[in-house]
From Swiss-Prot:
The keyword Oxidoreductase applies. GO terms for biological process: terpenoid biosynthetic process. This is Short chain aldehyde dehydrogenase 1. It comes from Euphorbia lathyris. Pathway: Secondary metabolite biosynthesis; terpenoid biosynthesis. Homodimer.
Amino acid sequence: MNGCCSQDPTSKRLEGKVAVITGGASGIGACTVKLFVKHGAKVVIADVQDELGHSLCKEIGSEDVVTYVHCDVSSDSDVKNVVDSAVSKYGKLDIMFSNAGVSGGLDPRILATENDEFKKVFEVNVFGGFLAAKHAARVMIPEKKGCILFTSSNSAAIAIPGPHSYVVSKHALNGLMKNLSAELGQHGIRVNCVSPFGVVTPMMATAFGMKDADPEVVKATIEGLLASAANLKEVTLGAEDIANAALYLASDEAKYVSGLNLVVDGGYSVTNPSFTATLQKAFAVAHV
């Protein structure tokens, strides 16, 4: 009879596994690359940020465990190439983490949303996710096992006054995840999403118009804004927290978890911040 705690707390949770991480050169992706390698995985970083990608490989320090491949996730040939490169170099593909994404503009008004911007966000966030899953499934189905992950957003769990292109693209990604889970489960392949609250990343800095600002100023400014809106206080969500969620879903600890949208938002999506704030004000007035 197996014990209920069979996992060695010091073990490498992805030992022997091979992963592709799109958008892996910076932000959540880069943090996940480092964590996956730490836990024994061999990782192919897929990104369009060539300098950052090569720099990350150099930082990790061994081509035996990490490789960079230029990949525009909206290009079928690029995505096919990165999957084929992983199989050619490391012999297989166990994990596809479709993490690449763009935010588009911050303006939440539909009349201010440019058609080309809307299409571009869908091209990267949705079509890019579709291509990642399609080419991962191509090599996973014959092996009758595998794990496909998407980075979604808590904005797809609720309606928020956010940019339509970004929010709707994440809703679409969640739908893709569910459909793939139903189809690919028949081949032993698990499919899940990780949906974070706001995290300070280069993508978010760009969305806030702070791409070239001092990193410490960016961090303090955006974290302050996020903290004021957050439901869970006294703790800050970081890229490492999303990487840890991805690690769990990619590991054998989650071997029977599929079709899940793991929302990492401190309970934000199950609350009504505006109503809560109104009640708090009313309570304060009543007890003056």
